From Swiss-Prot:
Catalytic activity: Hydrolysis of DNA containing ring-opened 7-methylguanine residues, releasing 2,6-diamino-4-hydroxy-5-(N-methyl)formamidopyrimidine; 2'-deoxyribonucleotide-(2'-deoxyribose 5'-phosphate)-2'-deoxyribonucleotide-DNA = a 3'-end 2'-deoxyribonucleotide-(2,3-dehydro-2,3-deoxyribose 5'-phosphate)-DNA + a 5'-end 5'-phospho-2'-deoxyribonucleoside-DNA + H(+)
Protein name per the record: Formamidopyrimidine-DNA glycosylase
Annotated gene: mutM
SUPFAM superfamilies attached to this UniProt entry: Glucocorticoid receptor-like (DNA-binding domain) (SSF57716), N-terminal domain of MutM-like DNA repair proteins (SSF81624), S13-like H2TH domain (SSF46946)
Taxonomic classification: Bacteria, Pseudomonadati, Pseudomonadota, Alphaproteobacteria, Rhodobacterales
Keywords from the UniProt entry: DNA damage, DNA repair, DNA-binding, Glycosidase, Hydrolase, Lyase, Metal-binding, Multifunctional enzyme, Zinc, Zinc-finger
Family: Belongs to the FPG family.
Coiled coil regions in record: none
Cofactor(s) listed: Zn(2+)
Organism from which the protein derives: Ruegeria sp. (strain TM1040) (Silicibacter sp.)
Length: 283
């Protein structure tokens, strides 16, 4: 599933073609994805200008001049890609639509934005912009890890007395929004903390050290265009390449990359998900 860096990468890639631009026509090619599309979705999108775009957790939000906000979740295999030149040249150079191209946005600058989702775990909805943050999917989210509300005192407070493993705590979207399995594994490695350790038993100094480490891991991944393991593509169709720099994720049995450590990467299962870590240098 695309995590925060992948969704941020896609959103940034869509902005030049969509932000400030009118959706000339929206084509919806099936009745649903994870859940049914909103009523009259084509009518409510066509002719509307995208005022601004932003990301919240793993959701892309596009505010429209109608007072509604388009919410998009990529699910497990969803992609949003741009074809055509948004400056107006080669506006007919669009590839033929594919089987799983479920929603197509024809922008009035000549760009075409296509939502492709083979597994159909993605989702779209239209929300009232003024009340978007109180929507049931967004209201339960914790602070953004790249935002000002994510700070040391927040994490110390969230971990206090918590008996769950730190890996599970960091994946709790009510504590931090947008973190996923890959980047939690990578952040815990950089911090030297075992994913098995109870969150509430980690010293305050080690908890506070996690905040800048989490930020840096996410920033590094965004700079690399995200991680492409199976389905993920950037908005221009290119692969991300942060996966080539993973320290632990997907490296079971391989040597630890920490200087001076002679351990190997271990994989365990926690809450149904694989955790990768070095048992020698992560404590």
């Amino acid at each position: 599933m695309p995590e925060l860096p992948e969704v941020e990468t896609v959103m940034r890639g869509l902005q030049p073609s969509m932000e400030g631009v009118v959706i000339a026509r929206a084509d919806v090619n099936r009745p649903d994805l994870r859940w049914p599309f909103p009523d009259r979705m084509t009518e409510r999108l066509s002719g509307r200008r995208v005022l601004s775009m932003r990301r919240r957790s793993k959701y892309i939000l596009a505010d429209l001049d109608s007072g509604e906000t388009l919410l998009v979740h990529l699910g497990m295999s969803g992609r949003m890609t741009v074809s055509g030149d948004p400056l107006g040249q080669f506006v007919h150079s669009h590839p033929q639509l594919e089987k799983h191209d479920h929603v197509v946005f024809h922008m009035d600058n000549g760009a075409r934005v296509t939502f492709n989702d083979p597994r159909r775990f993605g989702a779209m909805d239209l929300l009232e912009t003024a009340k978007a943050d109180s929507h049931k999917l967004l209201a339960v989210l914790g602070p953004e890890p790249l935002g000002n509300d994510f700070h040391e005192s927040h994490l110390v407070s969230a971990f206090k007395g918590r008996r769950t493993p730190v890996k599970s705590a960091l994946l709790d979207q009510g504590i931090i929004a947008g973190l996923g399995n890959i980047y939690v594994c990578e952040a815990l490695f950089r911090a030297g903390i075992s994913p098995r350790r109870e969150a509430g038993k980690i010293s305050t100094s080690r908890v506070t050290s996690l905040v800048p480490i989490i930020r840096q891991v996410l920033q590094d991944a965004i700079a690399a265009g995200g991680s492409s393991l199976k389905d993920f593509r950037q908005a221009n169709g290119e692969l991300g390449y942060f996966q080539h720099t993973f320290d632990v994720y997907g490296r079971e049995g391989e040597p630890c990359r920490r200087a001076g450590c002679t351990g190997t990467v271990t994989r365990i299962t926690q809450s149904g998900r694989s955790s990768f870590y070095c048992g020698k240098c992560q404590r």
